[in-house]
């Protein structure tokens, strides 16, 4: 179950990326049971993913607590650019931790923090990764499936409200 803080960060990430030429989707399930081993061998979910009209794919992993950050849930950094989004106080707790710094370096991850004024701020830029055509295709298909899932939920909600 998502905490209120996680929901807030997710919504603010959506608001910050909701621009002309950028499409976003939350909880993107990567691949299917047949393709999960293509990238990592594990079932992957990206908390929030955007795709630009130029085909650039950005992945955002949202963590709202130390337990969340250290949980067994995978951090899926599969896009051209990848960001870890977390509250500023959590970032301050882990900013000098060796395990955290190694994770940032190994994946060239950017850091976005939620400040006390309820604004997101880019603290650390990420390096752009080159993705193979196969990886890009898998991510685009996953994005489309997840967006269709969300559209289906809206259709169901509309029909429920019309009755």
Regions found by a protein language model. Name each.
Residues 46, 80, 109:
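Residue-level detector of short, conserved catalytic/binding motifs and their immediate flanks
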Residues 58-64, 82-86, 110-113:
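Short, hydrophobic beta-strand segments that form beta-sheet elements in well-ordered domains
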Residues 65-104:
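Short, charged, amphipathic alpha-helix that recurs within catalytic cores of restriction-modification
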């Amino acid at each position: 179950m998502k905490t209120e803080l996680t929901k807030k960060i997710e919504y603010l990430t959506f608001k910050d990326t909701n621009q002309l030429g950028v499409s976003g989707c939350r909880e993107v399930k990567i691949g299917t049971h047949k393709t999960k081993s293509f990238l990592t061998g594990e079932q992957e979910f990206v908390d929030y993913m955007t795709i630009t009209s130029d085909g650039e794919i950005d992945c955002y992993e949202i963590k709202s607590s130390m337990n969340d950050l250290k949980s067994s849930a995978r951090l899926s950094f599969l896009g051209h650019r990848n960001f870890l989004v977390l509250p500023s106080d959590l970032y301050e707790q882990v900013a000098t931790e060796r395990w955290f710094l190694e994770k940032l370096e190994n994946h060239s991850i950017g850091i976005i923090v939620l400040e006390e004024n309820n604004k997101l701020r880019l603290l650390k830029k990420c390096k752009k990764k080159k993705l193979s055509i196969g990886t890009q295709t898998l991510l685009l298909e996953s994005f489309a499936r997840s967006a269709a899932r969300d559209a289906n939920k809206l259709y169901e909600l509309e029909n429920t409200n019309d009755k």
